[in-house]
């Protein structure tokens, strides 16, 4: 998957859903990216899987994960992916990390970023190396927040000094680090980051305009 091409697809969908009806500051973008990392941490704290779908048939309050062990758990066991009660929305630790990546790609698309170095998910994962392989999710989230904070700092510093091109370039560099680590972590969970990215992007296409009038 070419990162720049996917960024344009993601940004087009964001525009179609009203997220760029008014321009947004880079600070807002950075905060929203970090909010996705925080949601990944909350999924981890709740002990939920990396990828899951809700069962919408359950009437009791709470979260019910669609994960039947056999036909005695659910009559739709053999047809689970087509079950009408299975939510279409992918959720979980890995999915929330992918959501953060989608927000980064949205900004890349907005700024028409062109990547000179590693420009595919596979290449970014190789760039991340093995330094993060044995880290727990909370440590990964801390690193991801650091990369985004660095991007925000460099962007603001350069904009303040009137260097718009440098602002984009420096912020992009740090956000690519975040993408590399997030994709690498997802891959190490046994999930395909490209497949998850495509899955969540396709779901996002079906969502309501501005997700029921969120302000940002």
For each of these PLM feature ranges, what is it?
Residues 1-216:
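Flexible "arm" and connector segments at domain edges
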